[in-house]
A protein has these predicted regions:
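Conserved RNA-binding domains used in RNP assembly and mRNA/RNA metabolism
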Residues: 2-64
């Protein structure tokens, strides 16, 4: 897993992101937390928290 992605997510806590996973799912929400292996977002569509492993990420877009 790219250290650049981990660093960018950790620096983006509280920001809105669009996450594309390797299984072709996509989630849009606000990053609420991150550690070395996982990160959590508040999914805007379902209004629920989702936890993902960094290894599941194909692409991530951080929106300011």
């Amino acid at each position: 897993m790219s250290e650049l992605i981990k660093k960018r997510i950790s620096e983006s806590i509280g920001k809105v992101v669009l996450v594309f996973l390797k299984n072709n799912f996509r989630f849009e929400g606000k990053i609420t937390g991150a550690d070395k292996l996982y990160f959590e977002i508040l999914d805007f569509r379902t209004n629920s928290y989702k936890i993902f492993a960094f290894g599941e990420i194909k692409e991530i877009e951080v929106r300011e």
